[in-house]
Amino acid sequence: KGSYMQGWLGSKEEDSGVNKQAEWRTDPKRSGAAGSVGDIGSHTMHLIEFITGLKCQSVAADLTTFVKGRQLDDDASIMIRMNNNVKGNLSISQIATGEENNLTISIYGEEGALHWSQENPNYAKFSKVGLSDQIITRGGAIKNANSYGKIRIPAGHPEGFLEGFAQIYSDVADIILNKKHKNNLLELLPNEETGLHIMKFINASVNSSKNNSAWTNLDSI
């Protein structure tokens, strides 16, 4: 389950004359066929796929434009079907009053669940059936081989959004210089196939919503 709630477009900011971000993000000539789904739904879908290792195969989407006069969607509910018979749903909104940048991901399995919030990025909650919840901290006692070299400051010191971009740049530089585990790094980085796949997700969501939320395969795009 993915939820990305923002509130900054709750009014028609694109007409204020001072909010350039709102102007281009709500303009179909510059941002494409989708509003909130393209802007933040794309990140939510990609993050779910990155965490699970699964791929979205089809969607049933309901895109809505609540702010009168706006050209693109500002709210969306999307059911997703992934490979391995996994199902999920996305709740996307840029008109959620009081929200700032509330991106949360929850992965539920038969034996456990994992929860993470972008606004509190240094912690994840792991729940296992029959046991107490466990809080996993960035840089804490639980580490794996992939985490070494990616944690730059000691545990308990905030690290997150900007460092995430820095890590991508660092991995790309290592690949170019043919350092470390090149193939392992390539598996972690987004590429042209990732971008194409997410564009298919966006367009499939738009098409689904236009067709009464009918299930739409990404491969049909």
Task: List PLM regions with ranges.
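C-terminal capping/lid region of NAD(P)-dependent oxidoreductase domains
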Residues: 1, 207-221
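Predominantly a Rossmann-like dinucleotide-binding segment in NAD(P)-dependent oxidoreductases
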Residues: 1-70, 124, 212
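C-terminal glycine/acidic-rich active-site capping loop/insertion
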Residues: 14-21, 25, 50, 58, ...
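Glycine-rich, aromatic-lined ligand/substrate-binding cores of catalytic
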Residues: 38-113, 118-122
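A general structural signal for well-ordered alpha-helical segments in protein cores
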Residues: 44-45, 168-173, 202
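Core catalytic loop region at the nicotinamide-binding pocket of NAD(P)H-dependent oxidoreductases
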Residues: 57, 88, 182-187, 211-217
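Alpha-helical scaffold segments in carbohydrate-active enzymes
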Residues: 198-205
